[in-house]
């Protein structure tokens, strides 16, 4: 990320948001990147003072940025810039607020892509099958006792040499097999939990083990703006989580260095090196699972859409789904009723004789 002479002002603004708005770390990171890129562009144009930036300058910046970014991204960038200049004006850094009338680009209301219920079931079945076919009983990497079989009658040196050369690859194979099994168990648990709860991928990767309440079959989720909610999950997700925590997680945890292990000690899901899993890996797990299951390619967010739509199809109340998804506005949740209507039209056309 390019640095600018305005980095100090950006830092102060982000600190203000963190203290007063309760925005998530991901949102703050995105705002910081948006502001740095915007002000770096003005710096390249010779701007040395925030007071030199006008509304026309900001509109010109938006025109440049909109060539390479979707409207949803531009909407976020505009909110960040408008918020920054409002803060700068309130704190006496500028004599005017040039962004006060800067318009946020309208975002077209598109129907989210979703899997059918049978496709979702197929996705989860394939993940469960992968656990079964990759099943490997991990023994913690213990080696067989030396000095047995043909090596017993030879000298200690020869015996040790034989064991070292023959058993080292075997131990490596055991570790590799155990890791593959552990990752399959983790992937199945991730897919089950995403679909069962409709949580966001950012919420998933930030979860700790303590956030799961198996007795009530619920999870505590920290969403946007650090707002917390409690979401229920079903028996298939419980089984997948228990298998991962009891069998798979200890295997991946052993691969971590002491420093990584300390940072990820409470993390629910781990990566291949034993650290807390990141969003990129979680997204890749979902995309890869969709390919292997032969269903339409989806993202974790599309799996969230699918969960919401299937709940509404099953008779759930709209406000219940709103609470589950952590939407601040009911209008956001209402998008999923449109999807259900489209599915109803398709079913009607296929099943009704006078369609």
Curated annotation (Swiss-Prot):
Family assignment from sequence similarity: Belongs to the 'phage' integrase family. XerC subfamily.
Active site, renumbered: 200, 224, 301, 304, 327, 336
Keyword field: Cell cycle, Cell division, Chromosome partition, Cytoplasm, DNA integration, DNA recombination, DNA-binding
UniProt subcellular location: Cytoplasm
Domain Core-binding (CB): 4-89
Organism whose genome encodes this protein: Bifidobacterium longum (strain DJO10A)
Biased composition (Basic and acidic residues): 168-178
Cellular component terms (Gene Ontology): cytoplasm
Protein's gene: xerC
Entry's Gene Ontology molecular function annotations: DNA binding; tyrosine-based site-specific recombinase activity
Domain Tyr recombinase as annotated: residue spans: 158-349
Record-linked Pfam families: Phage_int_SAM_1, Phage_integrase
CDD domains to which the protein is assigned, alphabetical: INT_XerDC_C
Subunit structure comment from the entry: Forms a cyclic heterotetrameric complex composed of two molecules of XerC and two molecules of XerD.
Protein name listed in UniProt: Tyrosine recombinase XerC
InterPro entries: CB (IPR044068), DNA_brk_join_enz (IPR011010), Integrase-like_cat_sf (IPR013762), Integrase_catalytic (IPR002104), Integrase_recombinase_N (IPR010998), Integrase_SAM-like_N (IPR004107), Tyrosine_recombinase_XerC/XerD (IPR023009), Tyrosine_recombinase_XerCD (IPR050090)
Composition skew (Low complexity), residue ranges: 141-154
One GO BP annotation of this record: cell division
PANTHER family per record: PHAGE INTEGRASE-RELATED, TYROSINE RECOMBINASE XERC
Biological role stated in the UniProt entry: Site-specific tyrosine recombinase, which acts by catalyzing the cutting and rejoining of the recombining DNA molecules. The XerC-XerD complex is essential to convert dimers of the bacterial chromosome into monomers to permit their segregation at cell division. It also contributes to the segregational stability of plasmids.
Main location: cytoplasm
Origin superkingdom: Bacteria
Region named Disordered: 137-181
